[in-house]
């Protein structure tokens, strides 16, 4: 009985792994998620903070701070779509494919050009998720689109003053 149960579990996990691997082939699109930004205003971030990644919100294992911290969010977060809200948290997909939870008060939809339905398209590229912005979508942390502090831009510019 134990051997047949163990065999069934092993077979089931191999089938599930095969389905999972097939679904996540490099370059394949990921559905069920949408791009949001962290809310720089709610987090009181300066452009310098955003450039350096200071003050970005934590990501948790579950929909509570007590569930354990997985890490810190990036500027663009991939939210489960439609939004999966629980206890003030929103479920997200992290860059490496892990599921996490972030406070719903520190994220917001992407900026969009007037009349645009722009969002994003996600794809799995081996071991990372990549996003491509749809026409009209802006991955800006600040309304004016000037995310790069002037001193950082000039230091990295190919065109000297």
Range-by-range predicted roles:
Residues 4-14:
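Sec-dependent N-terminal signal peptides
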Residues 16-21:
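Sec/Tat signal peptide C-region and signal peptidase I cleavage site
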Residues 22-47, 93-161:
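Boundary regions of SH3-family modules and the immediately adjacent low-complexity/disordered segments
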Residues 54, 58-64:
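Core beta-strand residues in small-molecule sensory/regulatory alpha/beta domains
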Residues 54-56, 85-89:
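Extracytoplasmic
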Residues 62-75:
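SH3/SH3-like (including bacterial SH3b) beta-barrel domains
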Residues 76, 90-94:
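SH3/SH3-like beta-barrel fold
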Residues 78-83:
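Beta-strand cores of secreted/periplasmic/IMS beta-sandwich domains, seen most often
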């Amino acid at each position: 009985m134990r051997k047949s149960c163990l065999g069934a579990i092993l077979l089931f996990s191999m089938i599930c792994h095969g389905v999972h691997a097939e679904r996540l082939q490099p370059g394949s699109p990921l559905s069920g998620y949408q791009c949001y930004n962290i809310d720089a205003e709610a987090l009181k971030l300066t452009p310098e903070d955003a450039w350096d990644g200071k003050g970005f919100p934590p990501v948790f294992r579950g929909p509570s701070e007590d569930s354990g911290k997985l890490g810190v969010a990036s500027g663009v977060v991939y939210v489960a779509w439609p939004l999966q809200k629980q206890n003030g948290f929103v479920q997200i997909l992290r860059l490496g494919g892990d599921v996490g939870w972030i406070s719903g008060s520190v994220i917001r939809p992407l900026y969009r050009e007037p009349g645009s339905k722009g969002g994003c398209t996600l794809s799995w590229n081996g071991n990372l998720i990549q996003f491509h912005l749809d026409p009209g979508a802006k991955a800006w942390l600040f309304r004016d689109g000037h995310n790069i502090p002037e001193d950082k831009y000039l230091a990295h510019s190919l065109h000297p003053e």
